[in-house]
Amino acid sequence: MKGNVSELLNATQQAPGGGEGGRPRPSWLASTLAFILIFTIVVDILGNLLVILSVYRNKKLRNSGNIFVVSLAVADLVVAVYPYPLVLTSILNNGWNLGYLHCQVSAFLMGLSVIGSIFNITGIAMNRYCYICHSLKYDKIYSNKNSLCYVFLIWMLTLIAIMPNLQTGTLQYDPRIYSCTFTQSVSSAYTIAVVVFHFIVPMIIVIFCYLRIWVLVLQVRRRVKPDNKPKLKPQDFRNFVTMFVVFVLFAICWAPLNLIGLIVASDPATMVPRIPEWLFVASYYLAYFNSCLNAIIYGLLNQNFRKEYKKIIVSLCTAKMFFVESSNEEADKIKCKPSPLIPNNNLIKVDSV
């Protein structure tokens, strides 16, 4: 531990930004990174709290499928309430001066958040796959009790996956990004294992689930003559697209950093100096930025969440109590009700292989 502490202290004493050889960085860079992080923190906290409150208040949104959505929101909140503010402090102070313990806890929680996010996104994809492609079995497999057990399992697997970081010495301060984080160059084998099991394997599972769903969607839409086979409702398709967009954005935001990890792990001594610092920093802050996007996507693409967001904001602005269930009287007057993000009742009764 003493060695790690001395490394941390040495890192904070490097030239601004900690670039190789003490190269100075553009004066605008710290301000830009601080702005990105402040925006991410504010939108992350407000947006994901809106998601959680929306599910809590609205009975239509309070169902077994949305348990995974709430769990994903919690994973995104973790980084906004502790690690990101510490990174922001590091940017403003041009170095880490918060000590070894805060560095380790911050890096641990960052890892917990990202692994929890990808595991929850995988759980959502499996939920959507079962709902659309095996809907006859959906109610039995995804009862409220079972869904809570699945979410508990997701977080247990997340803890198991992140614990080795505490023993491998990979959680260190990186002055290039002003963050205590997973250091890719410490162990090539471990870095490759992390990328494969924490990113590539979950991505393969998610891609498989969504490809099967797209195949079914195309099959349903190509039917010309009416038949007795059930049709895919527009609400189901919109709900599926919402979660598909969440997955695509996560993959886009995190793929560059994981690709860099594989490149670095191939030969740390040779590849680390070859990775442009701007690319490394951009890949990290793109990944950081992802934590604030999901709540925005729900609001843009899902009418039920959007309406509940508005109700909560209006309640706050008018000083009304918002920890109460939303009234369904107004909704009952509407003939065409939009389905929630992940509805309770199956609209498709198809059991495809």
UniProtKB/Swiss-Prot annotation:
The chain crosses the membrane at residues 33-53, 67-87, 106-126, 146-166, 191-211, 244-264, 278-298. Its main location: membrane. One of its GO terms (cellular component) is plasma membrane. Disulfide bonds join C103-C180. Residues 1-32, 88-105, 167-190, 265-277 are extracellular. GO terms for biological process: adenylate cyclase-inhibiting G protein-coupled receptor signaling pathway; circadian rhythm. It is a multi-pass membrane protein. It is found in: Cell membrane. Glycans are attached at N4, N10. Keywords: Cell membrane, Disulfide bond, G-protein coupled receptor, Glycoprotein, Membrane, Receptor, Transducer, Transmembrane, Transmembrane helix. PROSITE patterns: G_PROTEIN_RECEP_F1_1, G_PROTEIN_RECEP_F1_2. It comes from the Eukaryota. One of its GO terms (molecular function) is hormone binding. InterPro entries: GPCR_Rhodpsn, GPCR_Rhodpsn_7TM, Mel_1A/1B_rcpt, Melatonin_rcpt. The keyword Protease does not apply. Residues 54-66, 127-145, 212-243, 299-353 are cytoplasmic. Belongs to the G-protein coupled receptor 1 family. High affinity receptor for melatonin. Likely to mediate the reproductive and circadian actions of melatonin. The activity of this receptor is mediated by pertussis toxin sensitive G proteins that inhibit adenylate cyclase activity. Possibly involved in sleep induction, by melatonin activation of the potassium channel KCNMA1/BK and the dissociation of G-beta and G-gamma subunits, thereby decreasing synaptic transmission. This is Melatonin receptor type 1A. The gene is Mtnr1a.
